[in-house]
Structures are given as structure tokens and as C-alpha cells.
Amino acid sequence: EVKWGQKLAGLPILSPEESLTHRPDCVCLCVLDPERAAQMESQLRSLGYDGPLLNPGALRIFDARAATMRMLAEQIAELDIQGCAAELGVYRGEFAALINAALPDRPLHLFDTFEGFQERDLARERNLELSGARAGDFSGTSEIEVRLNLPFPQNAVFHPGWFPDTFHGCEELRFAFVSIDADLYDPTAAALPLFWERLCPGGALLIHDVYSGQFKGAGLALREFCASRSILAT
């Protein structure tokens, strides 16, 4: 709502109600998250739109993020790089399941509130206009659901709750692979030094949403972190 009336790539940003006054022949749901796509479809249908919908997220054949993770996992195994795997921002566990399958012999530490975004992480998002995130977004998950998605659930260690509080007790861990998909600035900024300082030589951090227009905080946190340590992110 805060972006209505503004422009993106020269195109006006309209409310769903106003956009339908233009009688579109087709509506494109320009999100990759299936839950958000379903919410958008439901909203459009409730407003009376009965035309065709194009969902690019459902058409993805090649997932560059998953392919990159598998390539890194293969290198970690081939080079016998020591350490655990971890993910911050698990949601329903789809990517965690891929990590679990690619590194089947490693403990996999999973950090998530499992209750969606927390209000305490949203002040900076609003003040800097980093996202339109709301408390409770991505709450449609549970630890049980994630565990059922994992091919090797016996290797999973769950850390439910607010990050970085949930990192307490993990200070002695060392990591070979870490996925950071927290979306927001505050948890991403908190996670980067904690995992970087515990990354084994040859290990990898994979950061999601670095160039996202929806969640700008992850990229901002990464740029600030790299600048402070003279690190080149690739």
C-alpha cells in the first residue's frame, strides 16, 4: 500500500481495485512464493476479476539458487571441508530439504521463528522503506511440517524463535555451508558476522534476496558487512 501511486521501472503502481478499472486482458502474478501468489489470486477473484492469470513462479524450470547450492555442496564434499550446514529463514523447509539431500551426512541447523516475521524486526524496514513486510508474514509453517519435508530428518537440529537469540549455544559450532534467507535487514545483519566468523576454510555462505526489489534489507546488510570487512561478495 505504501507504494501505490509511485512508479516501478517507469510503470505506475496501482491498487488491485484501481488496476481492474483498466479491464486487463490478463494479470501476471509477479511473485515466486506460491503462498503469496495464491493470496493475490484470491484477492483478484474476490474483486470480480475472472480473466486469465499468468503465474511465472509456477513456470520455473531451472532454479539457479538450488543449482548453486548443489554445486557448492559437491565441492564441499570433494574437498572434505569440515563443518555443519545451516539455514536461517526456513519457512516450510523446501530449500532446507535440498540442503539436507545434498549434504546427507552433515548436521543441519535450522533457525526460524516458525511464526513469521516478528514486529521487533520491522521498524528499520519501515523507516528505510526496505520492504512492505508485516508481522506474521510467512507464518504458515511449523517445525513438524519442515521435519516431514526433510529426506534425512535425523540430521536436523531445530532452533525455533527469534534470531539472534536462538544462536546462543551454537557459538562453538563450525560451518561448511550456510544459507541465509531471512528477507529482512535486522536478522540478516545479525547473522552475517555470526556465521562468517565460524565458517570453515573453503566453506560457503549463500545469501538470498541480495538483489530483491521486494526485500531490500538483505542486500543492504550484505553490502554493509562486506564493506566493513573488505570482502568481495560474488
PLM region spans:
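A solvent-exposed beta-alpha-beta segment
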Residues: 1-31
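Short, conserved catalytic or adaptor-binding loops enriched in Gly and charged residues
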Residues: 6, 45-46, 147-152
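Internal alpha/beta domain cores that form substrate/cofactor-binding pockets in large enzymes
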Residues: 12, 16-22, 35-57
